[in-house]
């Protein structure tokens, strides 16, 4: 107990009455001689004020003073009040510092004059209470630690007892101790105790014992020291075993403890995999508690990330279907986000990818593309982009395609990048998808995307590829070719042929220009935008590169930025072939001195290059001057040789060029040429030129899209940041779209009645280029 003198000293220190009186007095205006304060250096005024301007302030103070003490007290009453305050000083201090010691209902008069200004004792109350609680907690903490330290050896023995009742009681006590921080630290510092808890949890058949022991481990797992103790005591296999428990509380404790271990304990991932944790976790995906599912899916993501074996185990356990069901069923944002993260990791696995697609993953992920959660939308887009190359044959994609077209207008660069990439793959070799995208304004949206993207090739390249797919081989292809022009897309498309565009983007743009040239209305605008000189420039550069490599003894095709220069040669020549259908374009092409180069390309060992070279020469040879120039360059010999090509498209174009070159030749020459053409073009089934029937050339046949080939560097994947080390792969699909206006797969060359009828032969040529030219409308 405090002594009387201590209390009196405290009272003196904290008594506000005297201080308040002095302070209040000091605030009043009074006659100051200046001896003590030096406030005045002039004689005071007659009113006794230091400054006559303070009249208003003084009046206000006097008013407030009168308001506060407008009732009169006699001397006896004042002495009585003063006595009451003096008697209750100790109670006021006690009420502030130790309120629990006061008798209930006891009234203590307050010395507070102004409610806005607490007294010294009141200001002391809060910190004194905090100090008291800290001291109490320290005493309790020490007591808990000492109690636990003394009890742990005994409780360890009881947990190992043969009597299950004793074990249960001990487990309950340990669980209670683990709820307090001091005793929890004592438990985790005892390897014997942690081992006993793990062993008891693993071996017990009692539900309550399992709940208490798993709950204890859960409490320990909130500390790094506890995680290490659980790991060293073999807790992970035991916890994995508990994932098969029918009791929800045990399941929750087990999965959350494993989650903490996977997040923070080194070596935990491998231990969980070895204990069969993946299979157990996938089996738990049929539960309905959304928070439990969120933790479980996050565990799966941690285990699968960067580990191919884990991805295959999840696949074998039926994981893709279960994960897709979650995306289709629930609305809890955190669960959808964690599930989409697992699917994103699995979507770069070539084995899991088709399984997710077959389970309806594309449609399920598409449901959340308009969710307000940006992290969920972004994960769904990344996953869809990774899956999209395996989903080109999927049905029921209308809703997804419409949403993707809308997302092209987003201000988020990542969203636009993913949406363009997904559209590029989904429109590849899929007639219905092409129609749908065109019908929902996809052409306009893609052109606008290219215009907005500037030099961001991670956006422009997939957008150009999508346009390339949409402008070829479907019912609305011609409308799409016109729409690109009508939405002011031609200038920006031609501009992409120039620096700083890289070869992959240039390759895609060349293919798009070739498709746009299938529409006669685009011939003049493309010419006016300078497309022809730039195509010739690219052709010359690529051809020189291939020639230089050949002269240095290189036999294998080399890649520049993932693109073979032979592809650029083939693509530019093919685009010029289609553009040459216009007479004015032919004049420009011929004026750029291209005929010698085209003749040289006839000697290429690559059949596709032979065919496009023969094709462009066939168009140019319509003009007599060009036909003479072709002959002057010595084209007769290579063209005659190509008549015997196994590629029927090459042979047909070669025959057409030779025929056009023979227009002004003597009749004997024409007859000899007729015999040569007949014997060459109808080797397997001899017939004469004047026999009716089709030549049967399957020049326009569409090839199947080539699958993903990791050994082919031309197959490139888009990466937008990626998720850790797992590639955000967009495995491109090759699409053979060469003929423009023909929905059917075969475009036979009509039978020609007589070699002398030039126009019949010309009319028999395929209206479009051969679809065997796999370069166009292909990968991203």
Swiss-Prot record:
Gene Ontology MF terms in the entry: alpha-catenin binding; cadherin binding; nuclear receptor binding; protein phosphatase binding; transcription coactivator activity
Query: CDD domains, from UniProt?
Result: CTNNAbd_CTNNB1
Q: In which tissues is it expressed?
A: Expressed in the successional lamina, also expressed in both the epithelial and mesenchymal cells of the developing replacement tooth (at protein level). Expressed in the enamel organ as well as in the inner and outer dental epithelium during replacement tooth morphogenesis (at protein level). Expressed in the differentiated, polarized odontoblasts that line the dentine matrix as well as in the inner and outer dental epithelium during tooth cytodifferentiation (at protein level).
Biased-composition ranges, Basic and acidic residues, are 735-744
Post-translational modification, briefly?
Answer: Phosphorylation by gsk3b promotes ubiquitination and subsequent degradation by the proteasome.
Q: Does the keyword Cell membrane apply?
A: yes
Q: How does it assemble?
A: Interacts with adnpa. Interacts with cdh1 during oogenesis and in the unfertilized egg. Interacts with ctnna1 and cdh2.
- Cross-referenced PANTHER family, in alphabetical order? ARMADILLO SEGMENT POLARITY PROTEIN
**Protein name per its UniProtKB record:** Catenin beta-1
């Amino acid at each position: 107990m405090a002594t009387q003198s201590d209390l009196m000293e405290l009272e003196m220190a904290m008594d506000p009455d005297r201080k308040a009186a002095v302070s209040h007095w000091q605030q009043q205006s009074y006659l100051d001689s200046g001896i003590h304060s030096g406030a005045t250096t002039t004689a005071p005024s007659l009113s006794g004020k230091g400054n006559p301007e303070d009249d208003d302030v003084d009046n206000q103070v006097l008013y407030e003073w009168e308001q506060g003490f407008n009732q009169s007290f006699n001397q006896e009453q004042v002495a009585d009040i003063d006595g009451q305050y003096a008697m209750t000083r100790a109670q006021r201090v006690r009420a502030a510092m130790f309120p629990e010691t006061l008798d209930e209902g006891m009234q203590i008069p307050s010395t507070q004059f102004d409610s806005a200004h607490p007294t010294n004792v009141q200001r002391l109350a809060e910190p004194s209470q905090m100090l008291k609680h800290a001291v109490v907690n320290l005493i309790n903490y020490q007591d808990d630690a000492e109690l636990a330290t003394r009890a742990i050896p005994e409780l360890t023995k009881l947990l190992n007892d043969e009597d299950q009742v004793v074990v249960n009681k001990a487990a309950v006590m340990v669980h209670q101790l683990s709820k307090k921080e001091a005793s929890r630290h004592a438990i985790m510092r005892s390897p014997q105790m942690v081992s006993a808890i793990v062993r008891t949890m693993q071996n017990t058949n009692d539900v309550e014992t399992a709940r208490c022991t798993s709950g204890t481990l859960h409490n320990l797992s909130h500390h790094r020291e506890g995680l290490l103790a659980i790991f060293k005591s073999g807790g992970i296999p035991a916890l994995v075993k508990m994932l098969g428990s029918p009791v929800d509380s045990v399941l929750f404790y087990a999965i959350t403890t494993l989650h903490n271990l996977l997040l923070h304990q080194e070596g935990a991932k491998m231990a969980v995999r070895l204990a069969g944790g993946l299979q157990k976790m996938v089996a738990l995906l049929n539960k309905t508690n959304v928070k439990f599912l969120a933790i479980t899916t996050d565990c799966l993501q941690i285990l699968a990330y960067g580990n191919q074996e884990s991805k295959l185990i999840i696949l074998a356990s039926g994981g893709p279907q279960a994960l897709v069901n979650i995306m289709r069923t629930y609305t809890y944002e955190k669960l959808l986000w964690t599930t989409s993260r697992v699917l994103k990791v699995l979507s770069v696995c070539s084995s899991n990818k088709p399984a997710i697609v077959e389970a309806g993953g594309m449609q399920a992920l598409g449901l959340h593309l308009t969710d307000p959660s940006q992290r969920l939308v972004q994960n769904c887009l990344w996953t869809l982009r990774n899956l999209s190359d395996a989903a080109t044959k999927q049905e029921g994609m209308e809703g997804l395609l419409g949403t993707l077209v809308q997302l092209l207008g987003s201000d988020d660069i990542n969203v636009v990048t993913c949406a363009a990439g997904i559209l590029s793959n989904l429109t590849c070799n899929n007639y219905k998808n092409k129609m749908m995208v065109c019908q929902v304004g996809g052409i306009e949206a893609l052109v606008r995307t290219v215009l907005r993207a500037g030099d961001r090739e991670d956006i422009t390249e997939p957008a150009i590829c999508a346009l390339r797919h949409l402008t070829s081989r479907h019912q609305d292809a011609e409308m799409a070719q016109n729409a690109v022009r009508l939405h002011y897309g031609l200038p920006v498309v031609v501009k992409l042929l120039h620096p700083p565009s890289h070869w992959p983007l240039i390759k895609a743009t060349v293919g798009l220009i070739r498709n746009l040239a299938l529409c006669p209305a685009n011939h003049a605008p493309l010419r006016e935008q300078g497309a022809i000189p730039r195509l010739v420039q690219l052709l010359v550069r690529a051809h020189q590169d291939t020639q230089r490599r050949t002269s240095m003894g290189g036999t294998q095709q080399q890649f520049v930025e993932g693109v073979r220069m032979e592809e650029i040669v083939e693509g530019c020549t093919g685009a010029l072939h289609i553009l040459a259908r216009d007479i004015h374009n032919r004049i420009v092409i011929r004026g750029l001195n291209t005929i010698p180069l085209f003749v040289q390309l006839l000697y290429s060992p690559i059949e596709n290059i032979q065919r496009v070279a023969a094709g462009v020469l066939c168009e140019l040879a319509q003009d007599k001057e060009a036909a003479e120039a072709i002959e002057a360059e010595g084209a007769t010999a290579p063209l005659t040789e190509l008549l015997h090509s196994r590629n029927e498209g090459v042979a047909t174009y070669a025959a057409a060029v030779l025929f056009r070159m023979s227009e002004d030749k003597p009749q004997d020459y024409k007859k000899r040429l007729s015999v040569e053409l007949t014997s060459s073009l109808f080797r397997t089934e001899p017939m004469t030129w004047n026999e009716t029937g089709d030549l049967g050339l399957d020049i326009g046949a569409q090839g199947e899209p080539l699958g993903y080939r990791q050994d082919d560097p031309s197959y490139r994947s888009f990466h937008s940041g990626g998720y850790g080390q797992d590639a955000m792969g967009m495995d491109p699909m090759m699409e053979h779209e060469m003929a423009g206006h023909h929905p059917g797969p075969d475009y036979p060359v009509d039978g020609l009645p007589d070699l002398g009828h030039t126009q019949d032969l010309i009319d028999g040529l395929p209206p479009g280029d051969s679809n065997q030219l796999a370069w166009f409308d292909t990968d991203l």
